Amino acid sequence: MASYPCHQHASAFDQAARSRGHSNRRTALRPRRQQEATEVRLEQKMPTLLRVYIDGPHGMGKTTTTQLLVALGSRDDIVYVPEPMTYWQVLGASETIANIYTTQHRLDQGEISAGDAAVVMTSAQITMGMPYAVTDAVLAPHIGGEAGSSHAPPPALTLIFDRHPIAALLCYPAARYLMGSMTPQAVLAFVALIPPTLPGTNIVLGALPEDRHIDRLAKRQRPGERLDLAMLAAIRRVYGLLANTVRYLQGGGSWREDWGQLSGTAVPPQGAEPQSNAGPRPHIGDTLFTLFRAPELLAPNGDLYNVFAWALDVLAKRLRPMHVFILDYDQSPAGCRDALLQLTSGMVQTHVTTPGSIPTICDLARMFAREMGEAN
């Protein structure tokens, strides 16, 4: 084959240009990498923050346990962020919780259609989720990288939240879907709105035998709440699936690769107590993904429509980084408090991003508590 000098010269020129280009890129990257390294070193000198989200089905004893834990610390080093009851009942809408339970009851009694119930439930869940999502967004600029948990000094501040945004944007919508009062499309719409998971997101789920759970729920008094055993079973089921889903994802599970292992359409599996990270990776059929093999979400060829598949990608991305812990609530309030305190020693702290972040976060948390913490 003939050799063409012009091609040889072009090749040599291209090679030289590529070499210079690589050199220029390396030179350009050096200051950026040096800046990033400097930023990391500066961040590592910042105070640390521990964020703990106490979550799980209602009625286990989360609020009592949390308040007992907060009472152990001083006002300056531990701050409680309560559930936004005033927003739910007054600021965001009127009597949201009563509206939810009444709507479910009317659906169960055949007084309204599933479609009518879904409209009310979807609107109500938007109200339930808004305070969590916006608070997460306000805190996000102050959250730096993870500082680790082993041999870490005590954090400058511990924030104890009554629930994470996924409670209102994933778990309760999914439970209402199991109850027939929300569509799977609406559940995935909420999933798409889950904020990106911040570093150091420690979520505490609960374990409690069902009979003990029913007993505790029957004894508590919450505005607008009804004792709905079917809903209790549904939300317990969803939180069990949530714990499994995090384990599945952190164990390398891919819903896209394993989707074919789900047969037929969604059949909600029986509930089980949430499990810790120990043990083998759960099967995809024991995760939240199984709920979304629903006819409404499938194209004629049996595959998920792309828009719903993308929502499941968002779900996987949001859940994978979470640090999940399981608290045994089948003990006295003081025992629960001590067990929670023990769990915090293994939780992941984060550095804050500025010298003023800690007092700013304290102010934000206290403003939230004053404005939304209790119904007026």
Swiss-Prot record:
Phosphorylates and thereby activates certain drugs like acyclovir (ACV), valacyclovir, and famciclovir to a toxic form, that leads to successful suppression of the infection, while the uninfected cell does not have this ability because it lacks TK. Mutations in thymidine kinase may induce HSV resistance to antiviral therapies in immunocompromised patients. The most frequently observed resistant strains are unable to express TK and are avirulent in animal models of disease. The lineage of its organism: Viruses, Duplodnaviria, Heunggongvirae, Peploviricota, Herviviricetes. This is Thymidine kinase. It catalyses: thymidine + ATP = dTMP + ADP + H(+). Keywords: ATP-binding, DNA synthesis, Early protein, Kinase, Nucleotide-binding, Transferase. Coiled coil: none annotated. Belongs to the herpesviridae thymidine kinase family. Used in molecular biology as a selectable marker to identify transfected eukaryotic cells. Used in cancer suicide gene therapy to selectively kill transformed cells. Residues 1-39, 260-280 are annotated as: Disordered. HAMAP family: HSV_KITH. It comes from the Viruses. One of its GO terms (molecular function) is thymidine kinase activity. Residues 19-32 have a biased composition (Basic residues). InterPro entries: Herpes_TK (IPR001889), P-loop_NTPase (IPR027417). GO terms for biological process: DNA biosynthetic process; TMP biosynthetic process. Its EC number is 2.7.1.21. ATP binds at residues 56-63, 216. The active site is at 83 (proton acceptor).
